[in-house]
Amino acid sequence: MKKIILLGATGSIGTQTLAIIRENPEKFQLVALSFGRNMERGRAIIQEFKPKMVAVWHTRDRITLESEFPNVKFFNGLEGLREVATYLDGDVLLNAVMGSVGLLPTLDAIEAGKSIAIANKETLVTAGHIVMRAAREKNISLLPVDSEHSAILQALNGENPERIEKLVLTASGGSFRDKTRGELSEVTVKEALKHPNWNMGNKLTIDSATMFNKGLEVMEAHWLFGVDYDDIEVVIQRESIVHSMVQFVDGSFIAQLGTPDMRMPIQYALTYPDRLFIPYEKNFRITDFSALHFEKVDYERFPALKLAYNAGKIGGTMPTVLNAANEIAVAGFLNGQVAFYNIEALVENALNRHTSISEPDLDTILQVDQETRAYVKTLL
């Protein structure tokens, strides 16, 4: 029985994680969790799973819940996330919060000796050198929840990492993959949130449409697998059936295929190296797909991916700037303050004004993160 700590319980990844826990009560117990502002959904989760510790974001929500659930210990804010992440009775932390707020709870959980299932890619994007060093020192494995990195982990199972030629991350191309740059000036939030293949949260769906999401995943792959940026390739795979691939020095490829359902990589991160049966509404059959399509990325059409590669190669605090600027720009788009095509421009503006600080410590990363957010907000 694994005792699970789940950060971001009401989000897309959190909801699908709860489904796995619900379907496997003999294997998993949810002992602690966090959620943000969705009180209705949060209450239902507490009532069903009966966690011992819960963190919410606002003080008023904590006070309300304390009166409703006197047997549960409640916390709030970032400190609440950090308390829950290190809950003594938990075995595995699955960090599914969105944004750089997930960094400190992950580091705290590593220090506490928890196993880590990481869905919060910003943790590695902003502080990969710190997080991976801490994990090595504590002999903690970071198991990826992203479908692409889970696919690579599976493709590398039993292989010699020194024989890797390159990693190939696949991308659907997002909601606007068939639109020209000129056509993006008129797109709406509603249109942007219609992903062709995946069911994801709002921020992630927008990041998929710009391909900033894939850029963050390139950085994440760099840290998780120790592969240079020049040896990480992104290709468009429209069907989202091939989740990613590894090419080896002999020219061969190993790929992981499956239905576009996040329950698959979630359960693999929780049970690695074992697997669980997952009930699907429709069983996946490879014969349902008469063809699988692979396309080169047009970096003029998707400049966000080029910005991310450049930021990753420069390193230091540059990825932190890219991530923070993108979070504010996407929030501005979702709130109607920014046109879709201006998301990239805002991020590029923030990158151009920043001089990267190499090997930043945690305080420097957090300071640059806050300064970047404040700056981009002035541009909205």
Curated annotation (Swiss-Prot):
The record, for Gene3D superfamilies, names: 1.10.1740.10, NAD(P)-binding Rossmann-like Domain
Presence of keyword Nucleus = no
Residues bound to 1-deoxy-D-xylulose 5-phosphate: 121, 147-148, 172, 195, 208, 213-214, 217
- InterPro entries xrefs: DXP_reductoisomerase, DXP_reductoisomerase_C, DXP_reductoisomerase_N, DXPR_C, DXPR_C_sf, NAD(P)-bd_dom_sf
| Known EC number | 1.1.1.267
- Any idea which UniProt keywords this protein has? Isoprene biosynthesis, Manganese, Metal-binding, NADP, Oxidoreductase
Q: What is this protein called?
A: 1-deoxy-D-xylulose 5-phosphate reductoisomerase
For this chain, the annotated S-S bridges are: none
